[in-house]
Amino acid sequence: MNLLTTSCQAVAHAAGQFNVYWRNGLQGAGLMSVSVHRSLPDPEVIAELSALQWLLCQRAVFGATQNGKGLSLKVSAGAIRKAVRAITAGDAEQFGKPHLKPYAHFLATRFAGAELEVDKDRSWIPERLPSDHATLSIRQPLPNTVEISGVGVVAVSKHAFERFGKWLCMQAGHDTWRLLRRMM
């Protein structure tokens, strides 16, 4: 099972700036400096969700073909798990924080079926800054993308993903993403 652990901490005296520490499995820690636009509500949750998406999709820490099957995520914000559950159940508006829905959408589609656990333990965070460091600036949700040979990187909308799943009569979201990627 692939394990990705993240922990988000606000940077002191810097509004909208967050350090998202991450580790792949039990070894190797990294750091993402995430800047969230000041107009966005719940910036710490958005920072952690955006870092997760960047690590899983753009950086592909578990490979480009990884989907939710065999993936375990430990996050520090309970709102992430609640948002994914609300999206999966189809009642994101009842969740109370519908503005998080576009940021958590990738976990309910491409990474559907991933085990999601809230863990506040920060003892694994190194005292020194990790050598693996990246920067991310967020004004809007990152797109869900797939690479199509001969075309390049293409964003997959929620509507396209859902229609493709219905067309295939698929039950599991991770199978839908895998087959969509294979067809592309």
What residue ranges belong to the model's regions?
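A charged amphipathic helix-loop-strand protein-protein interaction module that recurs
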Residues: 50, 175-184
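Arg/Lys-rich, positively charged N-terminal/basic patches that mediate binding to nucleic acids
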Residues: 139-176
